[in-house]
Design a protein with these regions (language model features):
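Structural detector for short beta-strands of small beta-barrel domains
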Residues: 3-13
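Conserved catalytic cores of phosphodiester-cleaving nucleases, focusing on short active-site segments
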Residues: 9, 112-142, 155
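Short, charged beta-turn/beta-strand-edge "cap" motif at the junction between a beta-strand
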Residues: 13, 53-58
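Short aromatic-glycine-enriched beta-strand elements
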Residues: 16-21
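Short alpha-helix capping/helix-loop boundary micro-motifs
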Residues: 29-39
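Short nucleic-acid-contacting surface segments enriched for D/E, G, S/T with interspersed K/R
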Residues: 37-50
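OB-fold/S1-family single-stranded nucleic acid-binding modules
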Residues: 56-73
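A short acidic/basic microdomain associated with nuclease active sites
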Residues: 89, 93-107
Length: 155
């Protein structure tokens, strides 16, 4: 997976889940944030971020916020990147020989990111990206949501 037209910037503020203010080449730009999670541990005023310049002249914003520098690590903020990277990895043989690779597959009442056959068995794969980091440990999700909380059968 590769990003083109990347430029560094300084994160200033995030007024809502969808946009951020970033200083790029001496100008304050409103950029689209490709991750609606809170990301408070990463998007700290003054941190270095990496933005991708859009090639679409009719867009409201010229840039997408793609990644945040934290220490010596670059943390991807693009919520679509994990599935794209996993799909490329599977298609290139990362899991060995598989067939019938499909994305966004419904099975019963659930939807899975990928389905494929491995050694004649149907497999399902759910991919998660992590933006919550604490002392080198990544976690998912970065905040609780109603879809992540379910009653325990032992209660």
């Amino acid at each position: 997976m590769r990003y083109d037209n990347m430029t560094p910037g300084i994160f200033l503020a995030r007024p809502n889940r969808f946009i951020a203010h970033v200083e790029i080449e001496g100008q304050t730009e409103i950029v689209h944030v490709k991750n609606t999670g809170r990301c408070r541990e990463l998007l700290v005023p003054g941190c270095t971020v990496w933005c991708q310049r859009s090639t679409n002249p009719s867009r409201k914003t010229k840039f997408d916020l793609i990644a945040v520098q934290k220490g010596d690590r670059l943390i991807n903020m693009d919520s679509q990147a994990p599935n794209q990277a996993a799909g490329e990895w599977l298609a290139s043989g990362g899991l060995g020989e598989i067939t019938e690779l499909r994305a966004e597959v419904k099975h019963g009442d659930s939807r899975y990111d990928f389905s494929f056959l491995k050694d004649g068995k149907r497999c399902f794969l759910e991919v998660k990206g992590c933006t919550l980091e604490d002392d080198g440990v990544c976690a998912f999700p970065d905040e609780l949501s109603n879809t992540m909380v379910s009653p325990s059968p032992t209660r």
